[in-house]
Amino acid sequence: MKYNALMYYGQKYFGFEELEMPACGENDMIVKNLTASICGSDTDTWLNGGELHYLPPRVEFGHEVVCEVVETGKNVTGVKPGDRIAPYPLKATPNPRKAGYLGGFSEYLYITNAKEDENFWILDERMSNKEAALIEPLSVSIHVADRANVTEKTIAVILGAGIIGAGVAARLVDRGAAREHIVFVDRSQYRLDLLAKQGFAGVNSAEPGWQQKLIGLTGMAYCVYGPGSAADYIFDCAGSIDPIAIEPT
């Protein structure tokens, strides 16, 4: 079977190729991509190249994806053609470092050693494709938020008001944290305004004196570096140098 694949060739250089899908192995599965969301790593790959994301030229990419099962090997159980699934990128390919190569922006992808609840999940019919495309980034949010010992008095600072940061905030609230004790730091006022509508405070780190504004919201604590935020937890959901200029306490 031939299919159209979106390929990464280099910085600001993507293109389509017609590729041949291998025959489905006894333990494997072929699925059709229905909806894919765009990860920040995909955007960075376009802008700056894929080397930092272990993405060499001439590979497929995209990993936040919802699929429909097309064919399963004879040893694959619990799933059938027509079922909608969400792959787990780290285990859907033989090499976890190639999670970004999954092929979520192509027509079809190939899942090796397909096992339900291990490298893919069957989706509830009540969940739309667009909602399901957020499973992968929200799983990152939940993974980190669940490491915190949360109470209604917990003060949390979230660096980055994108999908990962918003997911962390939602999970913290779900576990008992108070919205008024969660503060976002981001350079995008648009993002901060959206989260303000959900009851979260925000500080724009592109503005002068943002550190003092943050301390005003979280309280101040002293450490060997001097005064800093009294937050119980700081979640880095930006991966940028500037936002992490908050002195540790």
Predicted regions mapped to residue ranges:
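Extreme N-terminal starter segment of soluble prokaryotic enzymes
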Residues: 1-4
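Glycine-rich beta-strand-centered segment in the early N-terminal region that forms part
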Residues: 22-36, 50-91, 115, 124
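Short cysteine clusters
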Residues: 39
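Short Gly/aromatic-enriched secondary-structure transition segments
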Residues: 45-49
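Residue-level marker of beta-strand positions
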Residues: 64, 83-84, 108, 143, ...
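NAD(P)H dinucleotide-binding glycine-rich loop of Rossmann-like/cofactor-binding domains
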Residues: 91-156
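Mid-domain Rossmann-like dinucleotide-binding core that forms the NAD(H)/NADP(H) cofactor-binding site
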Residues: 128-208
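Glycine-rich cofactor phosphate-binding loops and adjacent beta1-alpha1 units
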Residues: 148, 176, 198-249
